[in-house]
Amino acid sequence: MTATWEKKEGNEGLLTVTVPAEKVNKALDQAFKKVVKQINVPGFRKGKVPRPIFEQRFGVEALYQDAIDILLPDAYGEAIDETDIKPVAQPEVSVTQIEKGKDFIFEATVTVEPEVKLGDYKGLEIEKQETELSDDELQEAIDHSLGHLAEMVVKEDGVVENGDTVNIDFSGSVDGEEFEGGQAEGYDLEIGSGSFIPGFEEQLEGMKVDEEKDVVVTFPEEYHAEELAGKEATFKTKVNEIKFKEVPELTDEIANELDAEANTVDEYKENLRKRLAEQKATDAENVEKEEAITKATDNTTIDIPEAMVNTELDRMVSEFAQRIQQQGLDLQTYFQISGQDETQLREQMKDDAEQRVKTNLTLTAIAEAEKIEATDEDIDKELEKMSKQFNISVEDIKNTLGNTDIIKNDVRIQKVIDLLRDNAKFVEGTKED
């Protein structure tokens, strides 16, 4: 077999492949064995028609398409290897010659990976992120943890305040007419949660139990119910009950409840500070890496094939479908609720898809330029890390993946990202007051 590659305009080229006649004849033999089982010829049992009779009756041409189907996949794969091209989409194939006793010749218009012209990726100016944990951040984390242990207590006296949970009855109307879904009794609402129409919760602040009030709000222009979007509504509202969160004091006992390894408040704070400091350092490093990736990608010039963007869009839509499925929705239901269709969703995602493709191509090109590879030791370390993270054995991970190619590529790219950050020039950011 022979193959030639002729680069055309942009990221396309013409792959011309010639398969020797010997293989063509073998493929025709295979095609005949398949086709003969499916035809009826008077005087012969099904599947027992001699080849000469078959060709006399139907012509050898009746076998050509099946022979092409047999020859094409392997021939195309071998041609890709021989010419060392990297297709990014299915080719457009045109058969030039298929005939018994002659070579099989076909042409394939192939879109290949684009040329990547790297710009500067070392010495990038990156903003140095703050890693020191402040006392305020520690206290905020403590308050957040104590908040999970808070109990809701009925407020006997007093008024509704931000953070309280109120039990209310309400009836909404637009232009004096009640609308569907605008009425409820015994509804619990946390003030400040932002779960109601903008302006509603704030107007309940200062109200007392058994007090009634007309709450006037305007539905957002982008409200999902088109008949209400942008309209002013009045909600006749009554407060039935007010509850507030009673947060426990941080004692040695509570500290142990929050952290089994801490027996005192001081031990709890020390352990928490250590964990938060480690997380802040990790988060800071990740932000710095993201900035380095973005700048290296921005400095790179690539003519990205539309086929690669479409493939990435397919992946992103699939990821989106999986996310909303976890919320009990499927894509069609989401489209009905949102008023979008898949075309609009893909258009909305297109810029991100292009950026993803450009980033991946940039990082891969840097890996090649720097001759960065993932060693067996690197892969073993990553497998051990995954084993601890997901609490499953290394062997089970290998069996699930089938091979370690994905891990190998991930580790390789992570090494590139480390290189970008390690070679960056850090500058101090402007601290906010």
Swiss-Prot record:
NCBIfam families: tig
GO biological processes: 'de novo' cotranslational protein folding; cell division; chaperone-mediated protein folding; protein transport; protein unfolding
PROSITE patterns: FKBP_PPIASE (PS50059)
Ranges of residues in domain PPIase FKBP-type: 163-248
The family this protein is said to belong to: Belongs to the FKBP-type PPIase family. Tig subfamily.
Catalytic activity: [protein]-peptidylproline (omega=180) = [protein]-peptidylproline (omega=0)
Keyword Magnesium listed: no
Location of this chain's protein in the cell: Cytoplasm
This enzyme's EC code(s): 5.2.1.8
Primary residence: cytoplasm
Protein name: Trigger factor
Organism, as annotated: Staphylococcus aureus (strain NCTC 8325 / PS 47)
